[in-house]
């Protein structure tokens, strides 16, 4: 069995929680059993809980001495598909298809949890070891099957039910037939553990509370156990409930301490085993949290060296037993931590400073020093300065109760770097000496917040600037300041400079940064004024800091700095949610341009041009750190005020740039991303002082939330332009402000307009929309440089917006009113100004490329999105030049090809998972007609969908009819039907002509039709996505047909993609086997496409004129879905057309779900008189970690060779459906909850699936 390493790595990257190192010696650990809960969720769901430290997966419930063929058997409830191994024709009880568990165990381990495999359970009751030799063989078998994989085991075809996944040890929950052999097994395990000294493995046991326990007392005395969690329930006279009921001879924890001290390992930790809910044990044995607290308080303090924590039976019972939104395990963890006088300090993630391997040398020294003073500058001449600050401190997360020092590294990447170090004080930092360094500077300072930081240090200068000289400010602050806090930091600081330039680097971070080592923004774009903004964030309690960070120099820039990407050899992931808002104002009181959380002071800016440009670091992969920051709900509001202020100074802003050219990286390592929780950035235009408040929703009291809901962050830019000057300039003393206000506070979402660095007045600013969909969004934003590029009124601007659960699509029209679906998240606001600047000349086209890469987070499907937007410059008459180039930036290997013709800006979006955002507008159509809305809002709570980047998206821009082709199949794990995408696109805009007459072509015409169909089955355990490509090739003249069904889908790992090639004279039939984990017998769907007669136009193929010439195009796809790549060969003749017959089909573009149904032909490319190129889009998603792999085709169901063990060469072993198991689902039993009524499964899951499948067909 070979599980895809990229799939597991992506899932781990998306679900890395607030990791603290596991401490086996802690007194506050929580252990829980998993695998036997009724209707239990996937293991990954419980990995999200920070309260859980140890998870026992149960059970290996059949022992070799009682098992078929001498093999053990397993039962993990609803988490396996029912297939078992077969030995020499004998079906064993060892499950072979437990893909979900195999996918989820590494995620739990990456979250700092230990996963043990439990032996025993309450059923069956014949479990027994008959000899020491049998005990040794049993231990060796389990070590080979579930321990580290060895070549010897694989070469002998040994079973690996979990693939290459390795458990962290073994648990003994022995309920029957005495204790013989278990000490031998434990000692044998210890010998095997010693073979892998680089990894720690554990042994645990769950005896019942009577002393001595008939099953495990001997093993505890004779072999070393690490943990002993006694079942203090279901047995009267020793249960924990006896201590509550006042039974003097009851709760015998003291006696068990003596058993431990006399055992083979006197240092073993003793846990109190409790039921996790009223129904998890017999009546009267459940303890409420109020009853647990005094018990823990007494015994933890009485036996601090032996008390280890609490064991719970079982995970699903805890999950369903909630208290104000907290599970029972959460509450128990809170109790343990509260009582524990010295809880273990979590180990922070790697805090190494990663400097760029290609430092940018300084080319222009700083011509003047900027003293750290708040004195306003009154001068008649500008102060020349040319510096750019790229501050990127790398931080890592700390818990609420610790103050771990975090090393931050800043890399200067500009024409004249100035290192801005974050300091833990209120002293502003500024450069006071010329700097011409060419080395990357890594500064470090401790950032140790130990409580939620609600810093609302919006610093405003109260001194006016009496400057009468023209000041051209071009400040670009490439700040990706990461705040290390266990909860969200509402705001870094909004700083208003008291100098003539109010370029105040307002870093309104709406979510904390989850990067143990950040790389500075790859380029400082045309930044000529550096604000050494160093507002410290080092509070140990809630802080309302008001320390000024003031730059008091008037800055004039004459030479823009050349932006040079910093190629980092060690890529990291920085936060996608840093909105670096720079306010450019003239001489007036300048308040905070970004009002952070809890700030209610009015934001009054004298400059109506206040662009909020996100400072986003682009890095496609993460460093190998292991500690993310999981903030609580955070919101920050950037308030843009346009209240005019009389001023005699002229301010020309050349535009703030998103200082995030792609930080090129050549390696990809496991990431530890940020998982923002409900972060939202709203930018509100206003013509009066605005009171902005932000709500900070803290996480639960026990610890930071691990897997929050997907957040939605849309950052827009407000551009005001009514005259030749962007500022509110007016004759001195006139008191009459110019009319450069924000006329359309909520118009079309403006992605970008080209910035200007020339001396001409301009009202243009750039903003890069960012889509925060999951844990580690990497947004690359590049604004091309041109002169005086202003988008006139009425020109549709393609917006980019996206959320993880809801999509935001805005189709712009001439009226400037946005089109927003009803499912838009209220925390996501798309707004921009669509006013025109009458005195600005149109310039050459500029393109903005935004690449969005989303890793997966729990319950957040991941995707690799490549968004390519061409925004040609348009003169005032809304016409655009043709031939605009499209370029694509994608952190993963996603390909987009498009052809943009006159007046047709084309958007090609390659989307997967639950993110969907695409909009096409026609530049030539003033009313925006022809825009095609293909956004599919998906609100599925999916479980760990891996990141995939296989879609090939092809879009053709036709005259007046733009086309949007989203390629990819969203996945989800909800109760609704996930979108099903079928798409076929062509690159020609020739109308199709449907012919109903007979075709008289003497030469046969070959047509290739590709149907992309996705079937999704929904079961309580998860869902499976199957995408099968059917290709049929036939000659209309002979009406003969052959068909091949290429099963490039999610197969069981290691199993080759199966292909069936029926050849039927009258048609073809393909059989698909799906959802083997919902029923013992595979469900068969038969799709029949009969051969069509030529008189029938509806089923006819596209006919092209005969020609001896032809050409062939070969497309290879899905190299990671099977052992060999799938090749599709398309052969199309070329010649002069005499007639065109077309299939009846939907227009080129996105085909809604369910339209590619049996008996309906897929659309094909229309032909033309010129040589026609038909591009076939084959959408083949990689295996989703949320789905149960399925075998397609008519071949026999067979796993890879690693599924089987062959003691002799004569037997063949194939996984078969178990016999005697109702509905193909393993029976549910209570396991460690001994002698309690067993839970039973029904056939509801199978019925639901069958009904759904029939409806889908």
From Swiss-Prot:
Main localisation: membrane
Location of region: Disordered: 364-429, 595-980, 1141-1174
Cellular compartments annotated: Cell membrane; Secreted, Cell wall
Residues of the active site: 175 (proton donor)
UniProt KW keywords: Carbohydrate metabolism, Cell membrane, Cell wall, Chitin degradation, Chitin-binding, Glycoprotein, Glycosidase, GPI-anchor, Hydrolase, Lipoprotein, Membrane, Polysaccharide degradation, Secreted, Signal
Protein EC: 3.2.1.14
Gene3D superfamilies: Glycosidases
Annotated GH18 domain residues: 28-339
Enzyme class: hydrolase
Biased amino acid composition, Low complexity: 595-696, 716-935, 1156-1174
Record-given protein name: Endochitinase A
Taxonomic source organism: Aspergillus niger (strain ATCC MYA-4892 / CBS 513.88 / FGSC A1513)
Gene name per UniProt: ctcA
């Amino acid at each position: 069995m070979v599980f895809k390493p990229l799939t597991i790595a992506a899932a781990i990257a998306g679900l890395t929680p607030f990791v603290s190192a596991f401490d086996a010696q802690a007194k506050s650990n929580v252990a829980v059993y998993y695998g036997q809960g009724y209707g239990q969720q996937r293991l990954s769901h419980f990995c999200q809980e920070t309260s859980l430290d140890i998870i026992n997966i149960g059970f290996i419930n059949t022992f070799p001495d009682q098992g078929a063929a001498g093999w053990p058997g397993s039962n993990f409830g609803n988490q396996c598909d029912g297939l078992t191994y077969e030995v020499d024709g004998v079906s064993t009880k060892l499950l072979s298809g437990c893909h979900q568990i195999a996918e989820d165990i590494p995620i739990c381990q990456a979250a700092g949890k230990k996963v043990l495999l439990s032996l025993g359970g309450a059923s069956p009751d014949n479990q027994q070891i008959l000899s020491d030799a049998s005990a040794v063989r049993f231990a060796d078998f389990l070590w080979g099957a579930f321990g580290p994989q060895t070549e010897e085991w694989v070469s002998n075809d040994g079973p690996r039910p979990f693939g290459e996944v390795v458990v962290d040890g073994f648990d003994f929950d022995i309920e029957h037939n005495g204790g013989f052999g278990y000490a031998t097994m434990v000692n044998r395990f210890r010998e095997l553990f010693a073979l892998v000294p680089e990894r720690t493995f554990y042994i645990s046991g769950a005896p019942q509370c009577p002393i001595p326990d008939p099953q495990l007392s001997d093993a505890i005395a004779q072999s070393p156990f690490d943990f002993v969690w006694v079942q203090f329930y279901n047995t009267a006279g020793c249960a924990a409930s006896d201590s509550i009921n006042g039974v003097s001879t009851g709760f015998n924890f003291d006696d068990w301490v003596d058993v431990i001290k006399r055992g083979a390992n006197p240092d073993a930790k003793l846990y109190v085993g409790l039921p996790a809910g009223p129904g998890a044990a017999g009546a009267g044995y459940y303890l409420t949290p109020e009853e647990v607290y005094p018990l823990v308080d007494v015994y933890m303090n009485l036996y601090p060296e032996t008390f280890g924590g609490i064991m719970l039976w079982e995970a699903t019972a805890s999950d369903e037993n909630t208290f104000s939104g907290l599970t029972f395990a959460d509450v128990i963890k809170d109790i343990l931590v509260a009582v524990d006088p010295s809880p273990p300090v979590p180990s922070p993630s790697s805090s190494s400073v990663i400097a760029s391997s290609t430092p940018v040398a300084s080319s222009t020294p700083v011509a003047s020093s900027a003293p750290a003073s708040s004195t306003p500058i009154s001068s008649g001449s500008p102060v020349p300065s040319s510096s750019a600050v790229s501050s990127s401190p790398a931080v890592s997360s700390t818990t609420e109760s610790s103050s771990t020092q975090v090393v931050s590294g800043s890399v200067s990447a500009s024409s004249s770097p100035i290192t801005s170090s974050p300091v833990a004080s209120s002293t502003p930092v500024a450069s006071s000496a010329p700097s011409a360094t060419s080395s990357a500077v890594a500064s470090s300072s401790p950032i140790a917040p130990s409580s939620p930081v609600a810093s609302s240090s919006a610093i405003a200068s109260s001194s006016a600037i009496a400057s009468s000289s023209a000041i051209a400010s071009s400040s670009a602050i490439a700040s990706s300041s990461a705040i290390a806090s266990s909860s969200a930091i509402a705001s870094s600081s909004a700083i208003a400079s008291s100098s003539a330039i109010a370029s105040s680097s307002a870093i309104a971070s709406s979510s904390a940064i989850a990067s143990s080592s950040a790389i500075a923004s790859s380029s400082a774009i045309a930044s000529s004024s550096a604000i050494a903004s160093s507002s410290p964030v080092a509070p140990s309690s809630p802080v309302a800091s008001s320390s000024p960070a003031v730059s008091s120099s008037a800055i004039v820039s004459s030479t823009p700095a050349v932006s040079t990407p910093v190629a980092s050899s060690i890529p990291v992931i920085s936060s996608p949610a840093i909105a670096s808002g720079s306010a450019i104002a003239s001489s007036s009181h300048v308040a905070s341009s970004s009002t952070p959380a809890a700030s209610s002071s009015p934001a009054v800016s004298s400059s109506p041009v206040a662009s909020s440009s996100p400072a986003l670091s682009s890095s496609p992969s993460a460093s190998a750190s292991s500690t993310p920051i999981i903030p609580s709900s955070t919101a920050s509001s950037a308030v843009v005020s346009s209240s005019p202020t009389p001023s005699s100074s002229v301010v020309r802003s050349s535009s703030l740039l998103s200082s995030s050219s792609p930080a090129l990286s050549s390696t990809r390592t496991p990431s530890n991303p940020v998982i923002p929780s409900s972060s939202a950035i709203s930018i509100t235009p206003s013509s009066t002082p605005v009171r902005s408040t932000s709500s900070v929703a803290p996480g639960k009291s026990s610890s930071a939330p691990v897997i929050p809901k997907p957040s939605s962050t849309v950052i827009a830019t407000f551009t005001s332009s009514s005259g030749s000057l962007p500022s509110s300039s007016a004759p001195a003393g006139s008191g009459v402000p110019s009319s450069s206000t924000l006329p359309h506070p909520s118009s079309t979402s403006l992605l970008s307009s080209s910035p200007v660095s020339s001396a001409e007045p301009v009202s243009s600013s750039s903003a890069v929309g960012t889509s925060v969909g999951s844990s580690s969004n990497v947004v690359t934003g590049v604004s091309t440089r041109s002169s005086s590029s202003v988008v006139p009124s009425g020109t549709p601007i393609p917006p980019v917006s996206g959320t993880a659960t809801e999509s935001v699509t805005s189709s712009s029209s001439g009226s400037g009113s946005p089109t927003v679906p009803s499912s838009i998240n209220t925390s996501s606001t798309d707004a921009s100004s669509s006013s025109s600047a009458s005195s600005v000349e149109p310039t050459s086209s500029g393109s903005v490329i935004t690449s969005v890469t989303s890793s997966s987070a729990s319950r957040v499907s991941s995707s690799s999105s490549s968004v390519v937007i061409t925004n040609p410059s348009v003169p005032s008459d809304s016409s655009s030049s043709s031939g605009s180039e499209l370029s694509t930036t994608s952190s993963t290997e996603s390909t987009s090809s498009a052809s943009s013709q006159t007046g047709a800006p084309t958007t090609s979006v390659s989307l997967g998972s639950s993110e969907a955002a695409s909009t096409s507008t026609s530049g030539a159509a003033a009313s925006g007609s022809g825009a095609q809305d293909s956004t599919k809002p998906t609100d599925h709570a999916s479980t760990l969908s891996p990141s995939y980047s296989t879609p090939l998206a092809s879009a053709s821009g036709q005259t007046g009819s733009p086309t949007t082709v989203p390629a990819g199949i969203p996945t989800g794990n909800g109760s609704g039907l996930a979108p099903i995408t079928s798409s076929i696109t062509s690159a020609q805009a020739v109308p199709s002509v449907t012919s109903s007459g007979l075709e008289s072509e003497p030469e046969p015409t070959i047509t290739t039709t590709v149907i992309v169909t996705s079937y999704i089955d929904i079961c309580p355990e998860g869902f499976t996505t199957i995408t099968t490509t059917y290709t049929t090739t036939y000659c209309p003249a002979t009406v003969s047909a052959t068909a091949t069904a290429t099963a490039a889908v999610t197969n069981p790992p290691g199993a080759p993609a199966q292909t069936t090639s029926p050849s039927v004279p009258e048609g073809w039939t393909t059989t698909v086997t799906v959802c083997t984990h919902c029923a013992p017998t595979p469900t068969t769907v038969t799709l029949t496409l009969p051969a069509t007669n030529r008189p029938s136009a509806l089923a006819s193929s596209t006919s092209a004129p005969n020609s001896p010439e032809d050409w062939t195009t070969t497309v290879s796809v899905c190299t990671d879905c099977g052992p060999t790549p799938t090749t599709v060969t398309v052969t199309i003749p070329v010649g002069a057309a005499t007639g065109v017959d077309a299939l009846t089909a939907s227009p080129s573009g996105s085909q809604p779900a369910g339209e590619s149904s049996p008996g309906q032909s897929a659309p094909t490319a229309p032909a033309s008189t010129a040589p026609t190129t038909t591009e076939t889009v084959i959408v083949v998603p990689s295996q989703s970690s949320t789905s149960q792999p399925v075998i397609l085709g008519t071949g026999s169901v067979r796993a890879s060779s690693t599924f089987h063990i062959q003691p002799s060469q004569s037997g063949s072993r194939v996984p078969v459906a178990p016999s005697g198991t109702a509905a193909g689902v393993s029976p549910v039993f209570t396991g460690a909850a001994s002698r309690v009524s067993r839970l039973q499964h029904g056939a509801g899951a199978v019925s639901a699936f069958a009904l759904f499948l029939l409806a889908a067909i």
